[in-house]
């Protein structure tokens, strides 16, 4: 074979580019060795966000060669932690397991207390999404979906804030099914409003399946309804709202809209504008962790199952909800239902 100068030059250029890419990746990996990475947690101690953050941290340490510290900043339905993460340097040393649902809905309803635009966070991966389950005071009047749908007095639900996942799910459910409801906000955490339900101060609450299961398995609260099209894998005996009643098209729209938001789930994010090389590495190692059979087994054993989601898919859902696909009249209706209708 005869090598012409131009061919040799091209081969050298390609080889150089490959070497440079490898060197760049190695340099990014080396950057993390000995560094401190802060994984911000906005949930209360013992909450699902707290547990997921603490399970994820040692796996990230192993992959990055860094020390990963879970930094708790609870408050304001996790928006305190969201605001904090928003203003951190985009140097790859700060991440947060964020409440994607609440963050998107807060933007949708024009919450002016927010300093951030969720669509501009650096999306790393979805860590988990899970159906929400209505759990109730076991000595109360609600034993089935039928009991709830036929209630003559307001169903009383405890929660943290108006877009904390509990209140907004409740509001859209009550609006869809045309039942009287009263949402009491102001509890500091899910543990507090779950305790209120255990005491009978409210009829119940709505939590993601892993949190709901902890209360149901101990007999403190009873699961009556899954707010999704599919049953919970952790609470398989609890029926879904969809299988329990024939829904009108309008009712199905409200429940499906909330389900679409739910798919965003708990997402690992960084501050806006993260350096591409560090972002690529963080996305790579996070995907490796969340698809590793040993990691998945460990998470599941603690009833905190992981369900990896591609960052591009999550960004697509966010942009669809906050973009122009939702007519303005419908957006205003959603805002009214979430922010005003049941308080």
Summary of predicted features, one role per range:
Residues 14:
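A glycine-rich, hydrophobic loop/mini-helix early in the fold
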Residues 33-37, 276-343:
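An extracytoplasmic/periplasmic, membrane-proximal ligand-sensing/linker region
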Residues 44-45, 271-275:
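Structural beta->alpha junctions
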Residues 265-271:
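A short beta-strand structural signal in non-transmembrane regions
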């Amino acid at each position: 074979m005869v090598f012409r100068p131009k061919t040799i030059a091209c081969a050298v250029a390609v080889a150089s580019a490959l070497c440079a890419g490898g060197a760049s990746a190695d340099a990014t990996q080396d950057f993390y060795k000995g560094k401190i990475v802060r994984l911000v947690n906005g949930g209360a101690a013992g909450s699902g966000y707290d547990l997921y953050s603490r399970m994820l941290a040692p796996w990230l340490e192993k992959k990055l060669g860094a020390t990963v510290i879970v930094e708790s900043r609870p408050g304001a339905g996790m928006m305190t932690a969201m605001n904090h993460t928003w203003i951190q340097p985009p140097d790859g040393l700060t991440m947060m397991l964020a409440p994607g649902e609440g963050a998107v809905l807060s933007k949708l309803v024009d919450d002016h207390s927010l300093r951030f635009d969720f669509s501009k966070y650096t999306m790393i991966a979805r860590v988990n999404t899970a159906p929400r389950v209505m759990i109730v005071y076991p000595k109360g009047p609600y034993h089935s979906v039928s009991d709830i749908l036929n209630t003559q007095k307001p169903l009383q639900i405890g929660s943290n804030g108006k877009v904390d996942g509990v209140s907004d799910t409740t509001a859209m459910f009550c609006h869809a099914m045309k039942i009287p409801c009263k949402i009491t906000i102001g509890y500091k955490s899910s543990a507090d409003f779950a305790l209120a339900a255990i005491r009978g101060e409210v009829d119940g609450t709505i939590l993601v399946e892993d949190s709901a299961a902890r209360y149901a398995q101990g007999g403190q609260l009873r699961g009556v309804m899954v707010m999704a099209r599919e049953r919970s894998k952790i609470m398989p005996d609890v029926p879904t709202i969809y299988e329990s009643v024939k829904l009108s098209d309008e009712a199905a729209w409200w429940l499906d809209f909330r389900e679409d938001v739910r798919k965003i789930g708990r997402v690992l994010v960084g501050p806006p504008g993260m350096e591409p090389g560090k972002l690529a590495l963080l996305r790579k190692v996070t995907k490796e962790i969340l698809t590793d059979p040993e990691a998945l087994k460990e998470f599941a054993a603690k009833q905190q199952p992981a369900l990896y989601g591609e960052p591009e898919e999550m960004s697509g859902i966010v942009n669809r909800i906050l973009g122009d696909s939702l007519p303005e009249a419908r957006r205003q209706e959603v805002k009214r239902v979430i922010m005003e209708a049941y308080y």
